Design a protein with these regions (language model features):
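Nucleotide-sugar donor-binding/catalytic module of glycosyltransferases
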Residues: 1-131
């Protein structure tokens, strides 16, 4: 495992996804790499998304919540990007969840290859399609 002196800002855009958000945030909070700044943007949700965001922020000091009027995915991401302090930026959609070692593996790959960007594949759950 690499030294945890590099901060990764993880940006989560959330709009009316109360049924998925807990699993998403749990998957980020439980990463094997811990030096994360987690920026969750409640993009004008009308369900319990905002409350769930605040609940998680109260439990984990790495989480900051931004509440804003609905600006769409790009607007939500850009709002968080303005305040992000990490040396690397990661994006997780609020209705997705990630493997426990995703950010550790991606950062390792960046450092080993002197890369400024890492991308990964995804698996579509509940469907026969996988990318």
């Amino acid at each position: 495992m690499i030294q945890e002196n590099i901060r990764i800002s993880v940006i989560v855009a959330a709009y009316n996804i109360e049924e998925y958000l807990v699993r998403c945030l749990d998957s980020i909070c439980n990463q094997t790499y811990h030096n994360l700044e987690i920026l969750v943007v409640d993009d004008g949700s009308t369900d319990e998304t905002g409350r769930i965001c605040e609940e998680y922020a109260g439990k984990d000091p790495r989480i900051q919540v931004i509440h804003q009027n609905n600006m769409g995915l790009s607007g939500a991401r850009n709002s968080a990007l303005k305040i992000a302090t990490g040396e690397y930026i990661g994006y997780v959609d609020g209705d997705d969840y990630i493997e426990p070692d995703m950010y550790e593996n991606m950062l390792d790959a960046c450092l080993e290859n002197d890369a400024q960007l890492a991308v990964c594949s995804y698996r579509q759950i509940g469907s026969e399609k996988a990318q």
